[in-house]
Design a protein with these regions (language model features):
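Anion-binding alpha/beta catalytic cores of soluble intermediary-metabolism enzymes, centered on
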Residues: 1-162, 167, 171-232
């Protein structure tokens, strides 16, 4: 397998690329990384610390449908997807239903039975205090009703969802999802494997600009693993 990786200001990707047992092509150009991926010159790509916005803008030119990102995290030996993590990606109920659809497909390909946790951000008894809070509570109820006949799905508080081993955790919106990610990974002990891109055929793993050598190595290895899985 051959993986492309972005080389920006964070040079940890260089050490990570040298410590894996497959070929990694480093590039300082968002356009070149996207081109290598779309033209199938590589089997997968990892953002590194290049601009995610620029890379996604190149990739989205090839896709009519929306591309979503879901972070693959590990806490206490339990792996789960957290979404949305892009602050502008999810705007409505239909977006969340699409993330659930794509996220469950992704886990099923890995042989994992989906268990979905919907995070409304508060308890139902607080309904009626604030319109925004009411919106997220009502949306969580709608999501559970629409999906419960297909998969296990439950409304949780975040800590309860993790303790109950939910493997798709859906935050109220992209801003809160991004804050949850940064708190778990950069302030806590949660491991990040990068964010998988859902809704596209190519394998693109988004990563934080602030990632460690080990974090970038995990993202490279995930990209390589998914590429191998795709070719079997």
């Amino acid at each position: 397998m051959k993986i492309a990786a972005g080389l920006g200001k964070n040079k940890n990707i260089i050490e990570a690329a040298a410590d894996v047992n497959f070929e990694v092509i480093l590039t300082e150009s968002e356009e070149e990384l996207s081109s290598m991926l779309l033209n199938k010159n590589v089997d997968g790509a990892v953002r590194g610390s290049l601009s995610s916005t620029k890379i996604l803008s190149f990739l989205r030119k090839e896709y009519i449908q929306k591309i979503y990102r879901a972070s693959l995290l590990e806490l206490n030996n339990h792996k789960f997807l957290l979404a949305p993590v892009g602050v502008y990606e999810v705007n409505n109920l239909q977006d969340k239903l699409k993330i659930i659809e794509l996220g469950t497909e992704f886990l099923s390909k890995l042989g994992i039975e989906p268990k979905i946790g919907i995070i409304s951000g508060t308890r139902p008894e607080t309904q009626g205090i604030d319109p925004k809070v009411d919106y997220f509570i009502e949306e969580s109820v709608d999501l559970v009703e629409k999906v419960k006949n297909k998969f296990f799905i439950k409304e949780y508080l975040l800590d309860d969802a993790i303790q109950d081993n939910a493997n798709i955790i859906l935050a109220p919106d992209g801003i809160s999802g991004n804050l949850i990610f940064r708190s778990l990974v950069f302030l806590g002990t949660t491991k990040s494997y990068g964010a998988v891109s859902l809704g596209m055929d190519e394998i693109f793993i988004d990563t934080s600009r602030s990632q460690t050598v080990e974090g970038y190595k995990r993202a490279l290895e995930l990209s390589n693993y998914l590429a191998k899985l795709k070719h079997t």
